[in-house]
From Swiss-Prot:
InterPro entries tied to this protein: Mechanosensitive_channel_CS, MS_channel, MSC/AndL, MscL_channel
Keywords: Cell membrane, Ion channel, Ion transport, Membrane, Transmembrane, Transmembrane helix, Transport
The protein's name: Large-conductance mechanosensitive channel
GO terms, molecular function: mechanosensitive monoatomic ion channel activity
Topology with respect to the bilayer: Multi-pass membrane protein
NCBIfam families per UniProt: mscL (TIGR00220), PRK00567.1-4 (NF001843), PRK13955.1 (NF010560)
Organism annotation: Bacillus cereus (strain AH187)
HAMAP family: MscL
Key word ATP-binding present: no
Gene3D superfamilies, sorted: Large-conductance mechanosensitive channel, MscL, domain 1
Amino acid sequence: MWNEFKKFAFKGNVVDLAVGVVIGAAFGKIVSSLVKDVITPLLGMVLGGVDFTDLKLTFGKSSIMYGNFIQTIFDFLIIAAAIFMFVKVFNKLTSRKEEEEKEEEIPEPTKEEVLLGEIRDLLKQQNSSKDRA
């Protein structure tokens, strides 16, 4: 059982996925900071000093922190847009690289193609010898 787990855990796809999750979490923190520390204050200046995180409805001792919810939605939209742009650029670069590799690769002829070429050459030789006779 341990060997099966090691084989699974250290497969290339699992390790790639783990790295992707860690990098994604770090990227999410960067974008959240961008939203919280840069974009929201700028938006607050444009809208007259509004800070979404402090918006709330109070009912006695309880509060509904709808401003924090709005901020979380805003974070999500910016993170989604940033990831979309990253994936779009990545896919464009990857497709260009694949196209270049396809252009550079000249496939070797298959056995059938080699055999057909030899048959063609033999037929040419036979036809040229018949024409001389």
